[in-house]
Amino acid sequence: MKDGFLKAAAFSPALRVADCTYNAQQVLAQLQAAAQRGVKLAVFPEFCLTGYTCGDLFLQRTLQQGALDALEWLLAQTRALDTVVLVGLPLLVHGKLYNCAAVLCRGQLLGIVPKTYLPNYGEFYEKRQFTPGSTEVQTVTVCGQQVPFGTSLLFRCRQMPSFVLGVELCEDLWSALPPSTFHALAGATVIANLSASDETVGKAEYRRALVANQSARLLCGYLYASAGHGESTTDMVFAGHDLIAEDGSILAETAPFAGDHAETELDCQRMEAERARNTSFEHTAEGYITVEFDLSPEETVLTRRIDPAPFVPGDPQRRAARCELILKMQADGLAKRLEHAHAKTAVIGISGGLDSCLALLVAVRAMKQLHRSAADVLAVTMPCFGTTKRTRSNAEILCGELGVSFQEIRIADTVRSHFADIGQDETVLDVTFENGQARVRTLELMDLANRTGGLVVGTGDLSELALGWATYNGDHMSMYGVNAGVPKTLVRYLVQYEAETAATAALHDVLLDILDTPVSPELLPAKDGEIAQITEDLVGPYELHDFYLYYVLRCGFGPAKIYRLAKAAFAGRAEYTDAVLYKWLRNFYWRFFAQQFKRSCLPDGPKVGSVTLSPRGDWRMPSDACATLWLAELEQLKLGEQ
């Protein structure tokens, strides 16, 4: 449960219709095994103590009492289990029969939640036996315990307040206004659905989409436990399709008829963080009763996959579609700005590296969208002390293949003159030596844009902005930054996508060579004609920094949790030892805080994903904020591992 992780499971035990004793034994067997695995929330299907397909037998007092006896037996047997358990049964309350979910924990009955929407169409006739539940909460006596009964119930863990459980049953989710919507608005971060959804052609896909979409709409974790083998097959079959979703993603799922269970860890902290940033998600708890319970705060072993590249879809088809969409977004943003400014040219500094390559590809797309010639893009290469033959050649070939206008401006003499003006020794390879070149390049581009009636297109990406890896008022500045919302790990895939769809073999080849070129600002003199300044040797691997960036900005997690996630995500990568992960995480926080002043005055640029650093939009941070708390948490983490 540390860091907000909750190990949860949805079960579909094999049962016997109307055999409550047998069914309770099946539930307990799965519960005991789950408890050994550290499961803290276990959800079983609708009517799992009786079977869903009892029909008019539900009206028999013998079956009703059998279900209560089974529940009482389960309460006694689970006294020592550190798990919240949900089971389904019929319950007679004040002369009316309800389809209910009972919530158990450590031998205590926490509450009873009746079903709100009773299906009475097609193969379902629940209104024949049952009464819809009411939002009004009342107290009833069940198994000798006084418990709350009603749909407006929430269950909160004292040891992990971010774990707040809401309950609904089967048809409730399929209705136009599910009770889970109100549960989430009242504070529930996890929804449990006890279901008996029969299987028909196409229903599994619909069910999967329904669960995923509801978890996305409610910013919650969603467990769906459905009836399976053992239900009567007189008119229907039940496949035991169990699902666990979180914020729109299916984390765990059983194949229909597999006879297994779904199990994973839900991140309750993340749900809390998502809701904190979403101001349209109002907290409305009026009329709700919250029941608190205790669980041992043990550390949860993570089995869920932690994606090491959260900005990049793993599936090739999805990735290709994502790349095309992003390129269109970038191009449309630039096209609008060129059109509005009546710009005659789009001026881009081309280095032969990844970022300027992507910006050039976007600019060509923008001109095509405006029905203008690619020649209206003016690509400028400005070789100086650190430029290598490889990058210079690639820049020229790329421009030729794209059909853009090309100009070379050798800036070495201009830089030397500038150094003479300020008294900089050319042999001293310090920050002034590096930044002086970057600022001269920006000066050339800005004035060239003025002369040609154009706009300077910025090339810096999101990862560089996060780390401050840009010269203030140098490559940091432009008139429109097309890459400002694109992290470095995604830049690579965008260029690769353009290579795979290239119109000519020469364009394909040069794009692949650019991809193969080490990332470098080329501000220090080359050694034997090769790049001497490798960015990732200086600031760290971009795949690590993009991982950290995602969880810092998208989720608001602290250093300790991000470090834990990184260890899980990069497990098996020999180059990423714990010490390496820690080193670059600390570096990330130090640079992120220290370099905010550069982000406070960013040029305009399009947002393309959920993480961005625009000071006018998603990220508003003072330039002089202190990183002390974050670095102190990292220091404590280091001490704890020693």
Each model region followed by its residue ranges:
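Enzyme catalytic cores with a strong preference for nitrogen-chemistry domains
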Residues: 1-347, 365-374, 401, 406
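ATP/NTP-dependent adenylation/nucleotidyl-transfer catalytic domains that generate, transfer
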Residues: 23, 161-163, 219-220, 232, ...
